[in-house]
Amino acid sequence: MEIYKKIYNSLLKLKEKNPLIHHITNYVTVNDCANIVLAIGASPVMADDIREVEDMVSIASALVINIGTLNKKTVKSMFLAGKKANELNIPVILDPVGVGATKYRTSIALELLEEIKFSVVRGNISEVKVLSGMNASTKGVDAESWDETNPIEERIRLVKSLSEKYNAVIGITGEKDVIGFKEEVYTVENGSSIMAKITGAGCMCTSVIASYCGAEENYLQATLSGVVSMGIAGEIAYEKTKNLGPSSFRTALIDSIYNLEESSFNERGKVYNA
């Protein structure tokens, strides 16, 4: 199909460019995010000191802002780097980890969205509902089970409305992913349930999306490519480790991202127009 050819072409562009992806992220998943960026074909840098973030983002091809482990210093760095990236037309990707869990976390996420132009926002259904002003509960940094059962039609409406509000690509990832920019929306049904058994699967997905954004000017195409790549890699990794456990799966996930081929998308892709 044409859509899988586009995804593979985006992957080839990424590998050829080897974009530098600047992360201001959390210290729980930082190593996995760095490794998956390397595996997909980009280069990671995890600089968050306020004295260098503007210089670092100036040489990057994309910036990830991940609010998983907030503190005063990194919050200041997020605003500085995000605004500098906007000045230089460098895409900024937001991962609003656990938004809704505390008032502080929610206020920071909303302030970031108000002061920085984000190209992409990726979160689970509970996080996106909070950003949309809806009532939602998060279980720490995970989506609540009742949010996960929301009809796909509601997720599509959320993506469209939040995309209009922030003029950004919105990605809701979960059992069924919804990715869209305004009226152009796709659903993706790739992935494995064991991805919920490792910490950082969502963070890694955001890093893969950012890697594509660093080489692909169409950020909807980049986001779709990132989500599909993670989902297919998750399926392959599960097949290789289904008799083992989550730790083996995590290693196999990074290996599977590294080994993605054109046939991976053509044979396994489950992308649908919404």
Curated annotation (Swiss-Prot):
- Reactions catalysed according to its record: 5-(2-hydroxyethyl)-4-methylthiazole + ATP = 4-methyl-5-(2-phosphooxyethyl)-thiazole + ADP + H(+)
Q: Which SUPFAM superfamilies match?
A: Ribokinase-like (SSF53613)
GO molecular function terms attached to this record = ATP binding; hydroxyethylthiazole kinase activity; magnesium ion binding
User: Which metal ions or organic cofactors does this protein require, according to UniProt?
Assistant: Mg(2+)
What are its E.C. numbers?
A: 2.7.1.50
Q: Which GO terms describe its biological process?
A: thiamine biosynthetic process; thiamine diphosphate biosynthetic process
Provide the residue positions that the database annotates as binding ATP: 122, 173
Q: In which pathway does it act?
A: Cofactor biosynthesis; thiamine diphosphate biosynthesis; 4-methyl-5-(2-phosphoethyl)-thiazole from 5-(2-hydroxyethyl)-4-methylthiazole: step 1/1
Q: Which family does it belong to?
A: Belongs to the Thz kinase family.
What does this chain do? Catalyzes the phosphorylation of the hydroxyl group of 4-methyl-5-beta-hydroxyethylthiazole (THZ).
Could you tell me which HAMAP family the record lists for this protein? Answer: Thz_kinase
Q: What is the name attached to this protein's record?
A: Hydroxyethylthiazole kinase
